Amino acid sequence: MAAVSVYAPPVGGFSFDNCRRNAVLEADFAKRGYKLPKVRKTGTTIAGVVYKDGIVLGADTRATEGMVVADKNCSKIHFISPNIYCCGAGTAADTDMTTQLISSNLELHSLSTGRLPRVVTANRMLKQMLFRYQGYIGAALVLGGVDVTGPHLYSIYPHGSTDKLPYVTMGSGSLAAMAVFEDKFRPDMEEEEAKNLVSEAIAAGIFNDLGSGSNIDLCVISKNKLDFLRPYTVPNKKGTRLGRYRCEKGTTAVLTEKITPLEIEVLEETVQTMDTS
């Protein structure tokens, strides 16, 4: 009996079924006169680095709404616990509410255990919460702090994945900031070296990304102290006017002039009070 051979095309490791589905949906929407919603574009540069005695976190201060600068001096470094802080990139409301929720949960955890929370505990709480919402919470975070086991620095993505690294940057200006880190980072830096490095990385994001701008905020966390430097530097200072820009009357020629008097109609009204006695 002859065997029948059927050609089966090779199957790769990736499935593009969802891409084909999205293309069909987009074509169907176009026929009906609709458009698929676009992904929200946000802009930020946040970064962190581990130095010899602790952590340095940094962020810019520009908040955008589309292509409009909504706030020139917003704070993107959020309080988690006395020894842990978190930088937020993405949707501002999501980063604010997410860090506030985890901060309150860590406070309850601290009251229950009677000691300061560990950084890995905050990392676990954040990643579990973000993974539960499958990326619909637009919060990209840089978590840093110092506990009994030493300094720790994590990057947390909106879908819940995390990395523990000696230097981290996230946001739309992260490519420029990462270039500075990869060029100048070295282990066991002193505090001033780490502050200057993070400041330079944030400045690279500010000058090379339209979504980042204004000032540079830093947060230095060590075992014995916490310094919140706001602002640390102001790379985009507003220029001063060099002269008087108001023209004198008569500088510009007037070709025609027409004066229209206003017609005012005066109405008189009398009000009679009602006797309620």
Swiss-Prot record:
The processes (GO biological process) annotated in the record are:
proteasome-mediated ubiquitin-dependent protein catabolic process
What EC number(s) does this enzyme carry?
Answer: 3.4.25.1
This chain belongs to which protein, by name? Proteasome subunit beta type-7
An annotated Gene Ontology molecular function = threonine-type endopeptidase activity
- Name the organs or tissues of expression: Expressed at a low level in colonic mucosa. Up-regulated in colorectal cancer tissues.
Q: How does it assemble?
A: The 26S proteasome consists of a 20S proteasome core and two 19S regulatory subunits. The 20S proteasome core is a barrel-shaped complex made of 28 subunits that are arranged in four stacked rings. The two outer rings are each formed by seven alpha subunits, and the two inner rings are formed by seven beta subunits. The proteolytic activity is exerted by three beta-subunits PSMB5, PSMB6 and PSMB7. (Microbial infection) Interacts with HIV-1 Tat protein.
The similarity comment for this entry is:
Belongs to the peptidase T1B family.
Q: Which residues cross the membrane?
A: none
Write down the chemical reaction(s) this protein catalyses. Cleavage of peptide bonds with very broad specificity
The pro-peptide lies at 1-43
Query: GO cellular component annotations, sorted alphabetically?
Result: cilium; cytoplasm; cytosol; extracellular region; ficolin-1-rich granule lumen; nuclear body; nucleoplasm; nucleus
Q: Where in the cell is it found?
A: Cytoplasm; Nucleus
Keywords from the UniProt entry: Cytoplasm, Host-virus interaction, Hydrolase, Nucleus, Protease, Proteasome, Threonine protease, Zymogen
**What's its job?**
Component of the 20S core proteasome complex involved in the proteolytic degradation of most intracellular proteins. This complex plays numerous essential roles within the cell by associating with different regulatory particles. Associated with two 19S regulatory particles, forms the 26S proteasome and thus participates in the ATP-dependent degradation of ubiquitinated proteins.
| Active site per database record | T44 (nucleophile)
Which organism is this entry from? Homo sapiens
Q: Which PROSITE patterns match?
A: PROTEASOME_BETA_1, PROTEASOME_BETA_2
Question: Per its UniProt entry, what is the enzyme's top EC class, as one word?
Answer: hydrolase
InterPro entries in UniProt: Ntn_hydrolases_N, Pept_T1A_subB, Proteasome_bsu_C, Proteasome_bsu_CS, Proteasome_sua/b, Proteasome_suB-type
Q: Which domain of life is it from?
A: Eukaryota
